[in-house]
A protein has these predicted regions:
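Active-site hotspot residues in diverse enzymes, especially metal/ion-binding acidic/histidine motifs
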Residues: 1-58, 63-163
């Protein structure tokens, strides 16, 4: 079962209905394309999402809204709404990537964003957004188990070895 299928199963287990080919943007050129939308236990994914990785990344964030958001948060001028949006995204990043995912990519020998994204079955854009979010959350670096994960100046992982 791939990550997207796991997310669909989790949604089903939590009684969240997922509409996988919804026309969220119409035929018009839109300034800000909407890839997914959560409302009252329902998730709509845009029909133009091409890959399983794209669908999984969007679904993870929309499930984040199910678990962390309440009310209508469409208006991003509201600080409260922006905080809820950030929480939903962070939930998705932790679900799809997480610090252990970054370590897993390091252990697998991934050398660049493309390889990390492929290893984690996500898009490169999603990875970059996650790193930016983690940089804001953790600062220059964070430690977990025997590893140091640097976010500034670039993503890097080091393993602490006792001598």
């Amino acid at each position: 079962m791939n990550k997207y299928e796991e997310l669909l199963q989790d949604a089903s287990d939590d009684n969240v209905r997922v509409y996988e080919s919804f026309d969220l943007n119409g035929d018009n050129e839109v300034v800000e394309k909407i890839d997914g939308l959560y409302m009252d236990g329902n998730i709509a994914l845009d029909k133009d999402l091409k890959t399983t990785a794209e669908r999984a990344c969007v679904l993870a964030e929309e499930l984040g809204h199910h678990y962390t958001s309440n009310g209508n948060i469409i208006d991003m001028n509201s600080l409260h709404n922006r905080k809820q949006e950030r929480q939903a995204r962070l939930h998705g990043y932790n679900r799809m990537i997480g610090l252990y995912g970054i370590i897993s990519a390091f252990k697998a020998g991934c050398q660049n964003a493309f390889e990390i994204a492929e290893h984690l079955h996500i898009t490169e854009d999603y990875l970059q957004e996650c790193i930016k979010c983690y940089r804001e959350k953790y600062g220059v670096y964070t430690t977990i188990d025997n590893y140091v994960i640097y976010f500034i100046p670039n993503l890097a992982v080091g393993e602490h070895i006792d001598i």
